[in-house]
Amino acid sequence: MIDKYEDPFIRIAVMIGGDEYLKVARSLLKAEDATDEEIASSTGLRINMVRKVLYDLFGKSLISGVRVKDERKGWFVYRWRSRREEVESFIENQKKKIMGRLQQRLDYENSSEFYHCGNDDCQRITFEGALEEMFKCPSCGKVLNLKKNDKAKKAFGKKIDEIKKDLQQTF
């Protein structure tokens, strides 16, 4: 369980992956330059789960790993450390990705006319699809009518504006 006063690194880790990520993130903050075996023993998680979490966080640039030779075993091991300074840029990048996807969807909604039969179980169809089906629903056979998508366009536009405003305030 986390609270709103928890370290942002831990909060982001939980959002990405849940309880396993929470345990690994807390362990990384407690012990700088920890190996995956040390993290596994401190969290009680299996080593393969710890490695999965570490590789995912590493792929998102939220942690860094340094390869060193273990003097006792002679093997190379990774020592992991959190990159707390990267949390803000990670959040900013995620917001930009979401905003881009929303903008693509808004552009699609703006550039297309949609048709629907009125049955909740059936999907709406673009004009081209309706024309191919002779304006008959391919699922139920009812006549397809023009369906307004103003609500969807307004919702996408509003969310895009919220994210833009948030990005301007934060950065």
UniProtKB/Swiss-Prot annotation:
Highest rank taxon of the organism: Archaea
Domain HTH TFE/IIEalpha-type: 5-88
Database matches in InterPro entries: TF_E_archaea (IPR016481), TFE (IPR039997), TFIIE/TFIIEa_HTH (IPR017919), TFIIE_asu (IPR002853), TFIIEa/SarR/Rpc3_HTH_dom (IPR024550), WH-like_DNA-bd_sf (IPR036388), WH_DNA-bd_sf (IPR036390)
GO terms (BP aspect): regulation of DNA-templated transcription; transcription initiation at RNA polymerase II promoter
An annotated Gene Ontology molecular function: DNA binding
Gene3D superfamilies in alphabetical order: Winged helix-like DNA-binding domain superfamily/Winged helix DNA-binding domain
Entry keyword set: DNA-binding, Transcription, Transcription regulation
Family the UniProt entry places it in: Belongs to the TFE family.
Role of this protein: Transcription factor that plays a role in the activation of archaeal genes transcribed by RNA polymerase. Facilitates transcription initiation by enhancing TATA-box recognition by TATA-box-binding protein (Tbp), and transcription factor B (Tfb) and RNA polymerase recruitment. Not absolutely required for transcription in vitro, but particularly important in cases where Tbp or Tfb function is not optimal. It dynamically alters the nucleic acid-binding properties of RNA polymerases by stabilizing the initiation complex and destabilizing elongation complexes.
Quaternary structure annotation from Swiss-Prot or TrEMBL: Monomer. Interaction with RNA polymerase subunits RpoF and RpoE is necessary for Tfe stimulatory transcription activity. Able to interact with Tbp and RNA polymerase in the absence of DNA promoter. Interacts both with the preinitiation and elongation complexes.
Free-text note on domains in this protein's UniProt record: The winged helix domain is involved in binding to DNA in the preinitiation complex.
Annotated protein name in UniProt: Transcription factor E
Gene behind the chain: tfe
